[in-house]
Amino acid sequence: MDMRVPAQLLGLLLLWLPGVRFDIQMTQSPSFLSASVGDRVSIICWASEGISSNLAWYLQKPGKSPKLFLYDAKDLHPGVSSRFSGRGSGTDFTLTIISLKPEDFAAYYCKQDFSYP
């Protein structure tokens, strides 16, 4: 049985999905942040177009994979400290960490979950 026809048909259907965009760009600031234990820090994330609250935050420690810790812009993953908080909707989002602890020092990334390539 030749499976190429259904795959081609699926490709055509995907081209006709109305209102679906796959080119949302994300920008974070600052790109580097110097902080000390006990500090309060904020990281801002912007989307090139509205993504509602479809934003997740990940942290990555050296030699480890990124780890989801906040989703839907403000909801903490189970077990994540309430020292972390997120807010925002549309195009502007903020991650805030209060009372920094040594284990908080990592790379932080925002990721939109509104559309996929």
Curated annotation (Swiss-Prot):
Region (Framework-1): 23-45
InterPro entries named in the record: Ig-like_dom (IPR007110), Ig-like_dom_sf (IPR036179), Ig-like_fold (IPR013783), Ig_V-set (IPR013106), IgV_Light_Chain (IPR050150)
SUPFAM superfamilies per the UniProt record, alphabetical: Immunoglobulin (SSF48726)
Protein known as: Probable non-functional immunoglobulin kappa variable 1D-42
Coiled-coil positions: none
Subcellular location(s) of the protein: Secreted; Cell membrane
Function: Probable non-functional open reading frame (ORF) of V region of the variable domain of immunoglobulin light chains. Non-functional ORF generally cannot participate in the synthesis of a productive immunoglobulin chain due to altered V-(D)-J or switch recombination and/or splicing site (at mRNA level) and/or conserved amino acid change (protein level). Immunoglobulins, also known as antibodies, are membrane-bound or secreted glycoproteins produced by B lymphocytes.
Residue ranges of the region described as Complementarity-determining-3: 111-117
The entry's keywords: Adaptive immunity, Cell membrane, Disulfide bond, Immunity, Immunoglobulin, Immunoglobulin domain, Membrane, Secreted, Signal
Gene Ontology CC: extracellular region; immunoglobulin complex; plasma membrane
Ig-like domain sequence ranges: 23-117
PROSITE patterns reported in the protein's UniProt record: IG_LIKE
Complementarity-determining-1: annotated segments: 46-56
Subunit structure: Immunoglobulins are composed of two identical heavy chains and two identical light chains; disulfide-linked.
Region (Complementarity-determining-2): 72-78
Source taxon at top rank: Eukaryota
Gene3D superfamilies: Immunoglobulins
GO biological process, one term: immune response
SMART domains attached to this UniProt entry: IGv
Region of interest (Framework-3), residue spans: 79-110
Gene from which the chain derives: IGKV1D-42
Keyword Membrane appears in the UniProt entry: yes
Pfam families, sorted: V-set (PF07686)
Region (Framework-2): 57-71
